[in-house]
Amino acid sequence: MERVFRYHVSGDILDEDYFKRMIRLAEDVPTCTFFTYTKQFTIVNNVIEKRKAAKKRALPKNLIILFSGWGKDFRPDNPHKLRTAEVVFKGEEKPASWFQCPEQIDAKKQWKCTDCFLHGTGCFDSKIKTIAFLQH
């Protein structure tokens, strides 16, 4: 079994049922870390609210959800303070508190998402609140 699984290299969470199945899979396979980026803030927030109302943990520890921001005009509704992934547009400067995705600054393109997983950094480090991606 893989130790890390990334959902949606291209795509997003479809609906609440789909997201609940993502949660169930993470609960059923605790030895694997699952992660995704999403712009489906309402779906995620609604499911978290329902889970909290049912006295359940908001999300399994092995399911990492990163809300995708897209500049000043597209801000995530983030009442549960989930971590975020933000675009740094050309000509803009990355805020110092944001972590730059290592894959984007690796000139030889040898660094991959799994490397961050293996090193416990980037998207897999809960202390890092915002991941920066350069516009491409």
Predicted regions and their residues:
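Class I S-adenosyl-L-methionine
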Residues: M1-H136
